[in-house]
Amino acid sequence: MKRFEYEVEKLRTEFVLNFNDSLTRAEEFVAEISQVASDINAKYGTIEVDAKSLIGFLNMSHLPLQIIINPINDEDLKRFNEICKKYEVKSYVK
């Protein structure tokens, strides 16, 4: 008897996102990510800001940003992954 094999995608705590093509997309991202209770930061090099802060986020939105969550529960982590996948940079070269 063959067992069913399911491939479960592992939830990530970091994504690289880029909003240099649209301030509107950056604003939409901040609005969506603000619905998540966990702390979420945007980082470029040594500069790090609260990803839920529109002003802080827009200051760096023209750069490829590393978005990092410190999840307080599985639901926040799942929602974070759903949001970030919509904006994810598919290939990034430093």
Language-model region placement:
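Short beta-strand-to-loop capping motifs
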Residues: 17-21, 69-73
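N-terminal amphipathic/basic-hydrophobic helices that include classical n-h-c signal peptides
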Residues: 1-7
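Conserved short beta-strand edge segments in small beta-sheet-based binding/regulatory domains
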Residues: 40-45, 85-94
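Amphipathic alpha-helical interaction surfaces in cytosolic regulatory modules
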Residues: 22-34, 47-63, 76-85
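Short, ordered loop/turn segments at secondary-structure junctions
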Residues: 45-46, 72
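Short glycine-/aliphatic-rich beta-strand segments at the starts of folded cytosolic domains
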Residues: 8-19
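Short glycine-rich, basic-tinged beta-strand/loop micro-motifs
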Residues: 11, 63-67
